[in-house]
Regions:
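Core alpha/beta nucleotide-donor-binding catalytic domains of modification enzymes
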Residues: 2-117, 127-131, 138-140
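Acidic-residue sensor for enzyme active/binding pockets
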Residues: 31, 124, 333
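Short Gly/aromatic-enriched secondary-structure transition segments
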Residues: 43, 186-190, 323-327
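Class I S-adenosyl-L-methionine
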Residues: 65-74, 87, 91-285
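C-terminal target-recognition/interaction regions appended to catalytic cores
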Residues: 227-378
C-alpha cells in the first residue's frame, strides 16, 4: 500500500514533488489559484475530484464531500503538508499574531488537520513565524489537543544541495509518539555538499533580451521558446535534479523585455555589482537616492549560491541579472535554482511562470524532509 499525503496551499507543486520523490503518493490537494493548480495537475496524475481549486475556508465547509477519499485508506492519511500564507507573522509590531486577520488561513490549515488526523504533518512558513512560537503552540493545542508532538527548525535550502540562499521555518508533528527531535536529526543527516549558481545555469542555450514590449507570447529562438528540443549536458547538477532520466525537451526558457537603459546596466555591471556600483553611476536612475535602492539592480555571482528566488520576478528580474549574459534569469533557470526537474512544465503566462516558481518550496529541500518522515513509516 503506498504511503499517502495531502497538500494544502499546493501552489505549482514544489513541496508535493519533493514529497513524491521521497516515495509518497498524493491523494488530494488544494490550491486557490487556477493557473497554479493547472501546473500541479499537468505534472502528475491526480484522479478527477481528488482536488479542490478554491479558498481552503470553502473546502473546510465542504469536507463531508471529500471524506471518502481519505477515510477509505487503510490506516488513514500518512501525511498532510502545506505552507499557509501568514504575512502577519512577519509584522514588526507586538500585536498578538492570533488576532491578525491575515492568519485565518493558518487556522484553516489547523482545522483541516483536526478533521483528517494524519500520522504526520509538515507546515512550512517564513522564519519570522518563530518569533511567535508561544502563540503557535497555544494554537496547535487548541486545534489538535495533546495527541500530536511537534517541533520546528529553520532549515537552509543550501544545506540540501539547493544553489540558493533560502531559509524556511519547518514545523513537523506526529501522533505516533515519535520525538520531533529524532525526525529533525534524520533531516540534518541528509545535508550534502551543495552547488553554486554556475552549476544550475551552465549548458542552457544563450538568450537575448526581448526588445519589444508586450510580445512575450511570441516564439523566437533568439529570445527563447516555451518548448524546444534540447540535448542537455549530463552534468552533476543535471543528475541531481533529474536523476538518470533522459530529458530531450527544454521548457519555459524564455527571456522578457528590458528597456535599453536596463540592458546597458546589465552589460556594465560586474558580477556582484549592485545599483551603487561606479560603473553605472552615469545611467543609474536611482543615483540620487540612498542605499535602500542598492539592490534595485544586482548581477548574480556565478561562483556563489543565488539570492532567494521570489515571486517579485514576475515584475522584473533586475535583481537577478544573469552572471554572464546581459539579461535577467529565465523562468527555467529560476526553476532549476529551485531544483525542479527539467521536464516539470510551468503553465500560464510568462509572468505567472516566475510567480509560480518564486512561491514554491525548493524540491530537494522538500525531498529531504519527506524522506526523513518516510523512514519512520517504512
Amino acid at each position: 500500500m503506498p504511503h499517502t499525503f495531502i497538500d494544502l496551499f499546493a501552489g505549482c507543486g514544489g513541496l508535493s514533488l519533493g514529497i513524491e520523490q521521497a516515495g509518497f503518493t498524493a491523494v488530494f490537494f488544494n490550491e486557490i489559484m487556477p493557473v497554479y493548480a493547472s501546473t500541479y495537475l499537468k505534472n502528475r496524475e491526480i484522479p478527477q475530484g481528488h482536488y479542490f481549486i478554491g479558498d481552503i475556508n470553502d473546502l473546510n465547509k465542504q469536507l463531508d464531500n471529500y471524506r471518502s477519499i481519505w477515510e477509505t485508506i487503510d490506516g488513514g492519511i500518512d501525511l498532510v503538508c502545506g505552507g499557509p500564507p501568514c504575512q502577519g507573522f512577519s509584522m514588526a509590531n507586538r500585536q498578538r499574531v492570533i488576532d491578525d486577520p491575515r492568519n485565518n488561513l493558518y487556522k484553516a490549515y489547523l482545522f483541516f488537520l483536526r478533521a483528517v488526523r494524519p500520522k504526520f504533518f509538515i507546515m512550512e512558513n517564513v522564519k519570522g513565524m518563530a518569533q511567535r512560537i508561544d502563540e503557535i503552540k497555544d494554537n496547535f493545542r487548541e486545534y489538535m489537543g495533546d495527541d500530536y508532538a511537534f517541533g520546528y527548525r529553520i532549515l537552509r535550502a543550501q544545506d540540501f544541495g539547493v544553489p540558493q540562499n533560502r531559509e524556511r521555518l519547518i514545523f513537523i508533528g506526529n501522533r505516533l509518539g515519535i520525538e520531533p527531535n529524532d525526525i529533525f536529526a534524520r533531516i540534518e543527516a541528509k545535508k550534502r555538499l551543495g552547488f553554486v549558481l554556475r552549476d544550475a545555469l551552465e549548458g542552457l542555450p544563450q538568450l537575448e533580451a526581448r526588445p519589444e514590449k508586450n510580445k512575450s507570447e511570441l516564439e523566437d529562438i533568439r529570445y527563447g521558446l516555451t518548448e524546444r528540443d534540447f540535448d542537455y549536458p549530463r552534468t552533476a547538477f543535471y543528475q541531481f535534479i533529474n536523476g538518470d532520466r533522459v530529458i530531450t525537451k527544454l521548457y519555459n526558457h524564455k527571456n522578457r523585455y528590458n528597456n535599453p537603459r536596463d540592458l546597458e546596466i546589465f552589460r556594465r555591471l560586474p558580477q556582484g555589482g549592485n545599483s551603487l556600483h561606479e560603473s553605472i553611476s552615469d545611467i543609474m536612475p536611482y543615483g540620487r537616492r540612498n542605499s535602500i535602492f542598492k539592490d534595485k539592480y544586482f548581477k548574480l555571482r556565478e561562483d556563489e549560491i543565488c539570492k532567494t528566488i521570489t515571486s517579485h520576478m514576475k515584475f522584473d528580474c533586475n535583481m537577478y541579472i544573469h552572471p554572464w549574459e546581459a539579461r535577467g534569469l529565465s523562468p527555467r533557470e529560476a526553476a532549476r535554482i529551485q531544483t525542479f526537474p527539467d521536464d516539470y512544465v510551468i503553465y500560464g503566462a510568462q509572468n505567472s511562470w516566475y510567480a509560480q516558481v518564486g512561491n514554491a518550496v525548493p524540491v530537494k529541500l522538500a525531498e529531504a524532509i519527506g524522506a526523513s518522515i518516510m523512514e519512520f513509516l517504512a
